[in-house]
Amino acid sequence: MKLKFCGFTSIKDVTAASQLPIDAIGFIHYEKSKRHQTITQIKKLASAVPNHIDKVCVMVNPDLTTIEHVLSNTSINTIQLHGTESIDFIQEIKKKYSSIKITKALAADENIIQNINKYKGFVDLFIIDTPSVSYGGTGQTYDWTILKHIKDIPYLIAGGINSENIQTVNQLKLSHQGYDLASGIEVNGRKDIEKMTAIVNIVKGDRDNE
């Protein structure tokens, strides 16, 4: 199982997380997010992440110029799109930056299968998150059984996942590749090493299927 920890805002937290066997660390570049980081800040934070961990920049409906600024000024190797980005736009990114991974976040709603089919083949990974009227993480969960119909597609489960409820998700025997956490590894808005370690022990312990 893969683990992505997201929404980092301090070198201290990045360094602590990087000592754990996780697969990706995310930084949010979206001004309406409480975890927003400037490109300069992301450059500094990403430089503290070792090369074996993917460095993800989360954006909402960015233009190509913004993506160019992120990729040319930081060590980011994955772009995570949280808006209504078009297939043409994604293809444009891929054409210009063939080595960059692209992740697409989708809401776990009645249109999930339709939206997966729309983006399938154009992105490297899906993040399936709690439906929300605004973009970005809510810290709220959803009915995970909606994911039972999703097979043969690489995706991570996001949305209020923490060490208390992750076992419930595991018992559903879904086809997900792992989890994406932000608020579930925080205390008072800061990443918490005990919470991060607890999640790692659950997900990367005897259930690691990589």
From Swiss-Prot:
EC number: 5.3.1.24
Amino-acid biosynthesis found in the keyword field: yes
InterPro entries attached to this UniProt entry: Aldolase_TIM, PRAI_dom, RibuloseP-bd_barrel, TrpF_fam
Chemical reaction(s) catalysed: N-(5-phospho-beta-D-ribosyl)anthranilate = 1-(2-carboxyphenylamino)-1-deoxy-D-ribulose 5-phosphate
Keyword annotations: Amino-acid biosynthesis, Aromatic amino acid biosynthesis, Isomerase, Tryptophan biosynthesis
Top-level enzyme category: isomerase
GO molecular function ontology, one term from the record: phosphoribosylanthranilate isomerase activity
Pathway(s) of this molecule: Amino-acid biosynthesis; L-tryptophan biosynthesis; L-tryptophan from chorismate: step 3/5
Pfam families in UniProt: PRAI
GO BP term, example: L-tryptophan biosynthetic process
Coiled coil residues, start to end: none
Listed SUPFAM superfamilies: Ribulose-phoshate binding barrel (SSF51366)
Stated family: Belongs to the TrpF family.
HAMAP family: PRAI
Record PANTHER family: N-(5'-PHOSPHORIBOSYL)ANTHRANILATE ISOMERASE
NCBIfam families on file: PRK13958.1
Protein name: N-(5'-phosphoribosyl)anthranilate isomerase
Protein source organism: Staphylococcus aureus (strain NCTC 8325 / PS 47)
Lineage summary: Bacteria, Bacillati, Bacillota, Bacilli, Bacillales
